[in-house]
């Protein structure tokens, strides 16, 4: 594999020599950093099993190598990448997989390391959504995830990825993560803090990642990380699990931040060793039980992961000063809720007791039940999924609800051919040889829901959102 020129500040190299264990070769570290990063994907098990996905793509000639710490993760090699980018394949568009760097699958693997089943989880720095969607898959779309993102421009991308993957159990917020310890004390069973960092581990993806690097900036970043970790630890319930991770390599932003928490709260903090997380995990194990992944160890990005348990309650932080404002939704119950549920079921949209119906004017929404106790405590950017808009003749079902809730074996399901599916993704109406009998059609491809549409005579009217429409080649092996 060809090498590329990476910019290394001299002070960074000195710091890495000091941080790297004697069992690792510094020359191999430099060599690994200069190799392009292997591509990797994670199969979305909310939509398809690993076995069924592998069978589906078997004719494509993709070479998949299992990632040892993630059962549904694979390194991928393709011969047709230039002709058909991975992100434009039909399987990606329908949410069957997520393009995710292998190392970044580690934090969620650690969060669920003891086969725990948290009901309320926070992803404190969630965009673009790789870890939020991975958490949702591990939870089976049940319980609730509070996915927070401080950067306003990245919240939209976060929602788009959550929607594409068919996730229904998520609430989005847009806050500085330092507010949660005070705003939501001891409200979460598990928390992932994939902290903002200096990004020293990503040079294989971005050779210029260290252009603005300095030892002083590392210390400034570590100060912010301590405040975020403190907030996360206060938001965690006693007995809960917290994973702290970064994509950087220096000790100040990694081990030192975790040790600061231990020094601050003593016996309330327990480090949970990760040496048994996967075969060969001990190659990256620190004396504290953390994983400090230098890129040459597993041929991936540099990464750091620590797993903590909160052993006892902490004194509350000062109450937050912001105002939440009036909540604009009302709960739907009784006959109203039954009418919506029956109408949705009739077109193939199904949900269970984990989701509750709420209304705002003509909009009907589904909120995860586990998030309802947080209403009034924080302001949400988006909560649950928008199910429908009501009008005089019934309901206009929303695309994100179809992707998350539709049953592909429903009587109104209509499976498209490859050519018809390409037309659908391009935003064009479908003219099938044998039109469906029903007026309301659940359009599917590869037995995955693509949308709800109306049959008008012999034509299926395209309902694919305009902002998602694609051009060009979309299907492997189909010219």
From Swiss-Prot:
Main localization of the protein described in the UniProt heading: cytoplasm
GO biological process per UniProt: rRNA base methylation
Subcellular location: Cytoplasm
Alphabetical list of InterPro entries matching this protein: Methyltr_RsmF_N (IPR031341), MeTrfase_RsmB-F_NOP2_cat (IPR049560), MeTrfase_RsmB-F_NOP2_dom (IPR001678), Nol1_Nop2_Fmu_2 (IPR027391), Nop2p (IPR011023), RCMT (IPR023267), rRNA_ssu_MeTfrase_F (IPR023545), RsmB/NOL1/NOP2-like_CS (IPR018314)
Gene3D superfamilies, per the entry: 3.10.450.720, Vaccinia Virus protein VP39
Keyword S-adenosyl-L-methionine appears in the UniProt entry: yes
Enzyme class of the recorded protein, top EC level: transferase
One GO CC term, this protein: cytoplasm
Pfam families: Methyltr_RsmB-F, Methyltr_RsmF_N, Methyltranf_PUA, YebU_pre-PUA_dom
Catalytic activity: cytidine(1407) in 16S rRNA + S-adenosyl-L-methionine = 5-methylcytidine(1407) in 16S rRNA + S-adenosyl-L-homocysteine + H(+)
EC number(s) given by UniProt: 2.1.1.178
Binding-site positions, S-adenosyl-L-methionine: 125-131, 149, 176, 194
A molecular-function term among this protein's GO annotations: rRNA (cytosine-C5-)-methyltransferase activity
Keyword set, alphabetical order: Cytoplasm, Methyltransferase, RNA-binding, rRNA processing, S-adenosyl-L-methionine, Transferase
Entry annotation: catalytic residues: 247
Physiological role: Specifically methylates the cytosine at position 1407 (m5C1407) of 16S rRNA.
Database matches in PANTHER family: 28S RRNA (CYTOSINE(4447)-C(5))-METHYLTRANSFERASE-RELATED, NOP2 YEAST -RELATED NOL1/NOP2/FMU SUN DOMAIN-CONTAINING
Record's protein name: Ribosomal RNA small subunit methyltransferase F
Species assigned in the record: Salmonella typhi
């Amino acid at each position: 594999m060809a090498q590329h020129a990476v910019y290394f500040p001299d002070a960074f190299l000195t710091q890495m020599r000091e941080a790297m264990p004697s069992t690792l070769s510094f020359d191999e570290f430099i060599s690994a950093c200069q190799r392009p990063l292997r591509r990797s994907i994670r199969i979305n098990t909310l939509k398809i099993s690993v076995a069924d996905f592998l069978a589906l793509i078997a004719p494509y000639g993709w070479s998949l190598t299992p990632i040892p710490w993630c059962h549904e993760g694979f390194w991928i090699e393709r011969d047709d990448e230039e002709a058909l980018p991975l992100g434009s394949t039909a399987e990606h568009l329908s949410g069957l997989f997520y393009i995710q760097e292998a190392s970044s699958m580690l934090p969620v693997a650690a969060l669920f390391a003891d086969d725990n089943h948290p009901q309320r989880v926070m992803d404190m720095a969630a965009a673009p959504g790789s870890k939020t969607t991975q958490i949702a898959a591990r939870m089976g779309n049940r319980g609730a995830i509070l996915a927070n993102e401080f950067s306003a421009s990245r919240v939209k991308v976060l929602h788009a990825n959550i929607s594409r993957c068919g996730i229904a159990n998520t609430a989005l917020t847009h806050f500085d993560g330092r507010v949660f310890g005070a705003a939501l004390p001891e409200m979460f069973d598990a928390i992932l803090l994939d902290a903002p960092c200096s990004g020293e581990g990503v040079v294989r993806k971005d050779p210029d990642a260290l252009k603005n690097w300095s030892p002083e900036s590392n210390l400034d970043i570590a100060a912010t990380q301590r405040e975020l970790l403190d907030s996360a630890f206060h938001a965690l319930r006693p007995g809960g699990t917290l994973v702290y991770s970064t994509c950087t390599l220096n000790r100040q932003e990694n081990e030192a931040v975790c040790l600061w928490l231990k020094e601050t709260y003593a016996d309330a903090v327990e480090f949970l060793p990760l040496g048994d997380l996967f075969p060969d995990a001990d190659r990256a194990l620190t004396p504290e039980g953390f994983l400090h992944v230098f890129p040459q160890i597993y041929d991936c990005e540099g990464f750091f992961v620590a797993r903590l348990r909160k052993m006892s309650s902490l004194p509350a932080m000062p109450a937050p000063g912001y105002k939440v404002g009036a909540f604009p939704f009302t709960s739907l119950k009784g006959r109203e809720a039954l009418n919506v549920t029956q109408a949705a079921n009739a077109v193939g949209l199904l949900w269970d007791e984990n989701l509750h119906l709420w209304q705002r004017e003509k909009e009907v929404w589904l909120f995860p039940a586990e998030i309802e106790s947080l209403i009034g405590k924080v302001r949400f950017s988006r909560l649950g999924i928008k199910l429908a808009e009501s009008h005089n003749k019934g309901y206009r079902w929303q695309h994100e609800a179809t992707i998350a809730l539709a049953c592909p074996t429903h009587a109104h399901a209509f499976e498209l051919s490859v050519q018809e599916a390409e037309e659908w993704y391009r935003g064009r109406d479908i003219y099938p040889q044998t039109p469906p009998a029903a007026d309301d059609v659940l359009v599917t491809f590869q037995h995955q829901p693509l949308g709800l549409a109306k049959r008008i005579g012999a034509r299926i009217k395209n309902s694919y959102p305009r902002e998602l429409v694609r051009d060009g080649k979309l299907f492997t092996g189909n010219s």
